[in-house]
Amino acid sequence: TLSTGLIGCNNEKKQQQTTTQVETTENKVKNNIEFKSDGEPVKDDSVLGKNTYVFSPTDNKDEIQEKVSQIFARQESNQFGDERYALLFKPGDYGTSLEINVGFYTQVLGLGILPTDTNINKLWVNADWMFHNATCNFWRSAENFSVNDYCMWANSQAVSLRRVNFNDGIVLSDGEGWSSGGFMADCKVEKMVSSGSQQQYLFRNNNWGYFENGVWNMVF
C-alpha cells in the first residue's frame, strides 16, 4: 500500500509538472508569434528552433520578399550545410508579387486553419543550380496555404506538399532534367498536374483538374 501511494504521488507530481511545462510553452509561443517575430527570427529559439520566421500580411511586402530571397540564396545549393529555416505565414493575402523560392532544409507553412486562409502568389523550386537535374533537390516542404500562380516543384525525395491549394497548375520537374520521387497529399490543383520526368511519386487524397505525363512507379 505504501509503495502504491508513493507511485500515485509521483504520478500526480509529474502530471502537475507536465501541465506547467505545456502552459509555459504555450505562453512562449503566443508571446513570440503575436508580439515579437514578424519578419524576424522568433526570439526564443527554445520554442520553435533557430531561424524561424513568422510573417504577417501587414508586413512590408518588399521586406518579406527580400528576406525570403536572402534565405533562398543561402540554401539553393546548400545540400551539405547545417542551416535550417522555417518560413511561417499568418493568415491573410500576401499580394500579387511575392515569390517564394524554396531551397534546401526549408519549410514554408501557412498558419491558418484552412489552406485558403493564407494566400501566397508564387511557390517555386527549380534545379538551375544543378543544370536542371532535380535528382539532387532534397529536404524541403510546403504546407497549408494557397498559391495563385503556376508552380514548379522540381524535387526528388525527402520533400512533401501537404494541404496546398493551387489556383493554377503545377509541374514536378524542371524542363527536360531528371527528377525522381516525392509526396503530395491533401492538395487541390485547379488545372494540370504535370509529372514531367518524375518517377516513384506518391499521391494521396488529392483533387486535380487533370494529370499528365506519368513515367513509371506512380502511386495514387
Residues covered by each model-derived region:
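N-terminal extracellular ligand-recognition/capping segment immediately after the signal peptide
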Residues: 53, 57-107, 113-116, 123-125
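Feature marks extracellular polysaccharide-active and adherence modules
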Residues: 90, 109-111, 121, 145-148, ...
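Residues at the loop-to-beta-strand transition
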Residues: 59, 93-94, 112, 124, ...
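C-terminal motif of bacterial Sec signal peptides marking the signal peptidase cleavage site
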Residues: 5-8
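Parallel beta-helix/beta-solenoid
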Residues: 109, 132-150, 157-166
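Bacterial signal peptide processing site
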Residues: 10-12
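Short, T/G/N/S-enriched strand-turn elements that build extracellular solenoid repeat scaffolds
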Residues: 63-80, 94-103, 133, 150-158, ...
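Predominantly polar beta-repeat domains that present long G/T/S/D/N-rich surfaces used to bind, process
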Residues: 27, 31-40, 47-50, 161, ...
